[in-house]
Amino acid sequence: MISSIYIFKILLSYLGVEYEINQLSEINQEFTNKLESYNQFIKHTQKDEDYLLGQSAVISRYISNNHNFSGKSLQESARVDDIVESVLEIIEEYVLPIINSNIINEEITKLLCTHFNDFENQLSKSTFSAGDSTTLADLYLFILYDITLRYLENHGHLAHHFNEKYPHLERLKLHFLSNKSVSEFINSNNINSQSSQLII
């Protein structure tokens, strides 16, 4: 199952950050009113001068910035942001509808391959997608590649579009899966067994 905190858990696991996830069983009016009082992206609170973040991409960047995982320069950071946004668009436009409907065809597969070819070409020019070290951009590429391949395990007639065609993306996958915490989390979440609830 891919949950709304799937990306965060992989990110925090990779960075070795301990975390506690609190989920609500229901959303009451009091909680709704509180959310409405916050800015869509970020809100400075007077009480403890903490920041409240509102969207998953923003939260991922916030975590990454605090762990030097967003690039070493403004140029690299901009590149990271660009890749993260691209991956989220692909997940929202193609991957989630495929998983939720359990329908995939040649046309959708070819569109995904076009994006994968672009990322593969970028990685063929440099070990990492943004700069000379692993960043949030690489993690997002890995997540996109991994969830796509794992879903296609149940659709063998389309898997040939991806098998052994993206060695650089495969290298990223092996890198992140070599992290024990990341590997354990992913192996315990089978996207083929339940519908996706990924919210981006």
Swiss-Prot record:
Residue stretches making up the GST N-terminal domain: 1-71
GO molecular-function terms, A-Z: glutathione transferase activity
Residues of the GST C-terminal domain: 73-195
TM stretches of this protein: none
Record GO biological process: glutathione metabolic process
Similarity comment text for this entry: Belongs to the GST superfamily.
Record-given protein name: Glutathione S-transferase domain-containing protein DDB_G0273153/DDB_G0273923
Classification lineage: Eukaryota, Amoebozoa, Evosea, Eumycetozoa, Dictyostelia
